[in-house]
Amino acid sequence: MKQQRQNMKRFGGLGVLVSLLAFAACEQQQQAAAPQESQPEKEAIVWKLAQTWGTGFPIFGDAVIKMADMVKAMSGGELEIRIDSANKHKAALGILDMVKAGQYEMGHSASYYWKGKDVNTMFFSTMPFGMIAPEQYAWFYYGGGMELMKKVYDKHGVYSFPGGNTGNQMGGWFRKEINSLDDLQGHKMRIPGFAGEVLAKLGVVVTNIAPGELYTALERGTIDALEWVGPSLDLNMGFQKIAPFYYTGWHEPATELQFMVNKEAFDALPAHLQEILTIAMQYAAYDMYARSYHDSAVNWASIEEEYPEVKIRTFSPEIIAAMKQANEELLAESAAADPAFKEILESQSAYMKIARKWTEISDYAYLKDNLE
């Protein structure tokens, strides 16, 4: 695994993919040109992957299909990954347990869904008021994030890899306008991760619900509000028909999904298949980030015309200040009680200070000077 992790940092996913495909093409041409003795075909290694998403789920599910297709192509069919959606395995929020138990060799989900089992898994999705996607990817691959994630997941018998980023998420769909902290009291909201802890501290009744059940829960009044992703996915799910107030984000500035691999299964693979799988996961993750950004931009451009019922809102400075204060207090409490939590928090905080200075003088300065 150590060598595999070093390779992850050494190679750029797309460059290596191109090189591997070129190498494979040359090898096939050479094999076709030269007569060879017939050799018995190797029996394919067939893995199963369980995903949180339902059949045909856009963007998230597409990333999993892309990864599996790349693995099969680059391995010449030596490794095949078959995908089971939540419709089949019926355990959308049980992916970690199934991969850990070896019921599935792989999984695709979001790390913060496991905070009830291990609070430190939250850090590897996103944290309120934390890093944006470029900063977070840099932390993962060059700032120690991968090492810390391995340390957390080792105890679960699982390797975890970045599985695709949504970018900055919207703050949620609400039935009624939220104008003050009093409006949040007793509000029932679906929101996962550490952001849920923050809102609970402010009086919100927080729950987590599987993606396939969100619309029904909102429609039946089981919840008063929910956050999901952003325009790339939310509008097609129809939340605006029930809860038209759509708030800008604060809680998930760079939500990273997650590929999980059973540790014993991965270690049993030949080295070249480990490398192929790692490259395919990395490429599929970044491709999902680009796709999510594209779809959000396209949907946002037409939101007023196509979805006139949507009312865009931003939380007041008073509410944002209270969220930040609650976030800081909860982080301090958790860090004092858990050395591992403290280690990861300090790593992210230190890296964000470095990265944010560059973000301010590069992207932020450019946008500030060029936004119309």
Language-model features: locations:
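Bacterial N-terminal signal peptides that target proteins for export
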Residues: 2-14
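Glycine-centered signal
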Residues: 2-5, 23-25, 33
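Hydrophobic alpha-helical segments, principally membrane-spanning helices and signal/leader peptides
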Residues: 10-13, 118, 142, 247
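N-terminal secretory/targeting leader peptides
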Residues: 26-136, 153-372
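A gly/proline- and charged-residue-enriched helix-loop-helix capping module
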Residues: 132-150
